[in-house]
Curated annotation (Swiss-Prot):
Keywords: Ribonucleoprotein, Ribosomal protein, RNA-binding, rRNA-binding, tRNA-binding. The keyword Nucleus does not apply. GO terms for molecular function: rRNA binding; structural constituent of ribosome; tRNA binding. The gene is rplE. One of its GO terms (cellular component) is ribosome. This is Large ribosomal subunit protein uL5. Part of the 50S ribosomal subunit; part of the 5S rRNA/L5/L18/L25 subcomplex. Contacts the 5S rRNA and the P site tRNA. Forms a bridge to the 30S subunit in the 70S ribosome. InterPro entries: Ribosomal_uL5, Ribosomal_uL5_bac-type, Ribosomal_uL5_C, Ribosomal_uL5_CS, Ribosomal_uL5_dom_sf, Ribosomal_uL5_N. This is one of the proteins that bind and probably mediate the attachment of the 5S RNA into the large ribosomal subunit, where it forms part of the central protuberance. In the 70S ribosome it contacts protein S13 of the 30S subunit (bridge B1b), connecting the 2 subunits; this bridge is implicated in subunit movement. Contacts the P site tRNA; the 5S rRNA and some of its associated proteins might help stabilize positioning of ribosome-bound tRNAs. The keyword RNA-binding applies. Pfam families: Ribosomal_L5 (PF00281), Ribosomal_L5_C (PF00673). Gene3D superfamilies: 3.30.1440.10.
Amino acid sequence: MTRLQEKYQKEVVPAMIEKFGYKNIMEVPKLEKIVINMGVGEAKENQKVLESAVNDLTLIAGQKPVLTRAKKSVANFKIRENMPLGCKVTLRKANMFEFADKLMSIALPRVRDFRGVSSKAFDGRGNYSLGIKEQLIFPEIEYDKIDKVRGMDIIFVTTANTDEEARELLRFLGMPFAQ
């Protein structure tokens, strides 16, 4: 059991029951999955760029990402249908908690001028989206080995019904929200 899973069961669940007055322990929202997406626009000209993005994401997430492809051809963007344009990885269970712990305790504090993440990026259904501008904040990525600084989107999918519940869940887990 990971450190964050233990914290969830021992501290977060009782705190959420107290705050929201759940009658059943199964009503307490939990993290369902974390999706990390890396869109690589330059991949349309150079497939090698996509390979390095896949390698970076493999190091960061600890599992191999799946390629994302263009849904339809767009002449203005010079892309064809089914052309690989990025990669994404879906983390669940232990991998998800390991990544969330690493993100909140190590990676986010390494961001330049970090004052906390926005608390307005909830989607209305209890899911939280977070954009990162550079992959260098993760300890697995070596500065000398990267060819280009790339960003990524990280989506926390929870079982919470409202944004308020999801915000409290993530706050109790240790997400550094800006005041």
